[in-house]
Amino acid sequence: MPARKPAGARPEKPCPICGKPAVAASRPFCSERCRDVDLNRWLSGSYVIPVSKTDGEDAE
């Protein structure tokens, strides 16, 4: 009999770096290597979060 997932379980998502199935130890990645690649992208500035000015901020 196949193992059943709980009713509220989220569907498994692939590794965001290489697309392979994720493993629990490195989730959401498939390996330590993909975790390190993602961390390097954040630290090197490849990934950025856009910021928009709001009315309360002073213009410089």
Curated annotation (Swiss-Prot):
Role played: Inhibits all the catalytic activities of DNA gyrase by preventing its interaction with DNA. Acts by binding directly to the C-terminal domain of GyrB, which probably disrupts DNA binding by the gyrase.
The alphabetized list of GO BP terms reads: regulation of DNA-templated transcription
**What InterPro entries does the record point to?**
DNA_gyrase_inhibitor_YacG, Znf_NHR/GATA
Q: Which SUPFAM superfamilies match?
A: Glucocorticoid receptor-like (DNA-binding domain) (SSF57716)
Q: Keywords for this entry?
A: Metal-binding, Zinc
Q: Which PANTHER family match?
A: DNA GYRASE INHIBITOR YACG
UniProt similarity note: Belongs to the DNA gyrase inhibitor YacG family.
Copy out the cofactor comment.
Binds 1 zinc ion.
Q: Does the keyword Metal-binding apply?
A: yes
Q: Where does Zn(2+) bind?
A: 15, 18, 30, 34
The molecular function GO annotations come to:
DNA topoisomerase type II (double strand cut, ATP-hydrolyzing) inhibitor activity; zinc ion binding
Q: How does it assemble?
A: Interacts with GyrB.
Report the superkingdom from the record.
Bacteria
Q: What Pfam family is a match, any one? A: YacG
Name of the gene this protein is made from: yacG
Q: Which cofactor is recorded for it?
A: Zn(2+)
Q: What is this protein called?
A: DNA gyrase inhibitor YacG
